[in-house]
């Protein structure tokens, strides 16, 4: 079967089996095309909480599927590709952060959504890159322990100088590998292009950007801008989606290093096989984990508006 035929089979199966498909924006175009909802982590979290179907199929990474299960515990949630983890989410665990909390008892723990369900159970609030500044700004606490991404934490701290931040050494290895030298090379090659970067990038890269924002923020900025040429400083799929959506504009990836192997692990055939019952993985979380982890996600949605 070709791509179009597989997509049609998927559309038939998801209707037949009452499945809602969620796809992160870093997924390949052919996967996003068959999804009911696409977007960044924050949007997908909100979407997951409103799903009416009996089943949810996540095309993304494990923590995203766990978040779906936490927000919709009565649904059966599947991860299309079981091997799709997140290197950032695996950097810190509940035991480690419990020890850090003892060192800083007067600090509120703000967890990037790129964390495991188990770790979320001891955090005060979750944030995404699109909601972090707003949420932390709305928190009454002045002292913030921000985990795990130190680059995003640095970005948020600079927007909110009235708060005290403690950052740990964690982050996205894909975004963090981008350097100021990469930026200089790209700007020299495309001198008329605006640079749009994700706050998971190093501060030295963020400081050189024309716009800093989440994946959704970057896409909205580029689509609505009067400018016609952009350098995209986040996962390569965003540049590809933008080029498809805005054929009259030019999009260049900042560096070819911006490819997330975990996000690219999911294929259209994985989605098809999961719907057939021949692949994927059902996400199972115990009731206590769901109850405890849901508190910080609910707080994210409440403070994020």
PLM-predicted stretches and their roles:
Residues 1-232, 238-305:
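Active-site loop-to-helix "anion-binding N-cap" substructures in soluble metabolic enzymes
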């Amino acid at each position: 079967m070709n791509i179009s035929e597989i997509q049609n089979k998927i559309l038939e199966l998801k209707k037949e089996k009452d499945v809602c498909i969620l796809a992160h924006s870093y997924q390949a175009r052919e996967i996003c095309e068959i999804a009911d909802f696409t977007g960044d982590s924050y949007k997908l979290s909100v979407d997951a909480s409103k799903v009416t179907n009996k089943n949810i199929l996540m095309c993304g990474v494990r923590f995203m599927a766990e978040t779906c299960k936490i927000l919709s515990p009565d649904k059966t949630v599947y991860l299309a590709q079981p091997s799709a983890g997140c290197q950032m989410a695996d950097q810190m665990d509940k035991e480690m952060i419990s020890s850090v909390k003892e060192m800083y008892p007067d600090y509120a723990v703000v967890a990037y959504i790129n964390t495991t369900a188990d770790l979320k159970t001891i955090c005060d609030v979750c944030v995404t890159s699109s909601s972090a500044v707003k949420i932390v700004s709305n928190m009454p606490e002045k002292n913030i322990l921000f985990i795990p991404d130190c680059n995003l934490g640095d970005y948020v701290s600079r927007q909110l100088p009235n708060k005290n931040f403690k950052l740990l050494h964690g982050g996205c290895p894909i975004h963090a590998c981008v350097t100021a030298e990469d930026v200089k090379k790209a700007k020299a090659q495309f001198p008329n292009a605006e640079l749009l970067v994700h706050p998971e990038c190093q501060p030295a890269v963020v400081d050189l950007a024309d716009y800093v924002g989440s994946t959704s923020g970057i896409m909205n900025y580029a689509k609505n801008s009067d400018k016609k040429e952009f350098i995209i400083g986040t996962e390569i799929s965003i540049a590809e989606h933008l080029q498809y959506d805005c054929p009259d504009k030019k999009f260049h990836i900042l560096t070819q290093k911006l490819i997330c192997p975990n996000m690219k692990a999911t294929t259209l055939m994985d989605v098809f096989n999961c719907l057939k019952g021949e692949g994927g993985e059902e996400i199972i979380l115990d009731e206590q984990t769901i109850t405890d982890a849901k508190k910080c996600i609910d707080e994210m949605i409440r403070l994020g508006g």
